[in-house]
Amino acid sequence: MLHMPIPDAGVLARRTSIAAHLRRMVPDHAVIDSEVSLKAYESDGLTAYRQPPMLVVLPQTTADVSAILKYAQAENIKIVPRGAGTSLSGGALPLADGIVLGLAKFNKVLDIDYANRCVVVQPGVTNLAITRAVEQHGFYYAPDPSSQIACTIGGNVAENSGGVHCLKYGLTTNNILGLEIVLMNGDVVRLGGKHLDSDGYDLLGVLAGSEGLLGVVTEVTVRILKKPESARAMLIGFQSSEDAGQCVADVISAGIIPGGMEMMDRPAIHAAEDFVHADYPRDVEALLIVELDGPP
């Protein structure tokens, strides 16, 4: 059972003045304080736990984020950054005496550099939108969480998201080249860049998966890849989950890295088949769905 911290009564008593101060930093409509509107931010995808935040603010520039964080630190106000709220881990669960910093308005693709095989985007750009921006030139962004149509790249960095293809192509941390982040004192720093061997310490791995605890991401440089010439999927049935697991181990130990590999046990097979009617076989105990990509 998750126990939320007891709200700071002193901060809650200043709610009206805090909202007024925020409205001097961002447009009036970018501060959300009505009870009805705050309901939309009371949880992320982990809906078993929910509570409305004290306020929500929707900045549109790095300068906005910096000013808000400086103010929050000076006034001892808690901040919870939020992308699209698709996480199932509670990473964007708000605090009753805190401000949710919604980054949905940061949704621009800033630069596409095919020569260096990278794209610079704002954190509110969705995962799938990156691929959509480059696919006409034969490129794509490899990490593909199941929520890729909705989840944002900023949230992917915060959660170090993966997906079906992470076995071969890695998680978010393996596919980001640079970040612009705003520290909790409002300072803006840049880490990495378009080139693999950028100067300075490699702190990107520390930030990937930190859920906004170390700073707020305001710009991301991601690696893009050429689309494989072909991709084929196969479905393999097994009489036990142990046999399926051993098959995975045998494939990897043979030095073969499929583009994607997913295993389903009997309950998952039946649940999926009842819902989507994908024509999965019901007479097996486990399934491996394997994708092979590369030359035809």
Regions found by a protein language model. Give the residues of each.
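N-terminal flexible segment immediately upstream of the FAD-binding catalytic core
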Residues: 1-70, 74, 86-117, 146, ...
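Short, hydrophobic beta-strand segments
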Residues: 2-4, 49-55, 234, 285-294
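Short, acidic (Asp/Glu-rich) active-site segment that either coordinates a divalent metal cofactor
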Residues: 89, 100-103, 213-221, 295-296
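Structural motif
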Residues: 80-82, 91, 122, 144
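FAD-binding subdomain of flavoenzyme oxidoreductases
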Residues: 108-264
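Feature of Fe-S/electron-transfer and energy-metabolism proteins
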Residues: 1-14, 36-40, 57-58, 63, ...
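Terminal amphipathic helices with adjacent charged low-complexity linkers/tails
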Residues: 260-296
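Flexible loop/turn segments at secondary-structure boundaries
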Residues: 39-40, 87-90, 127-129, 224-226, ...
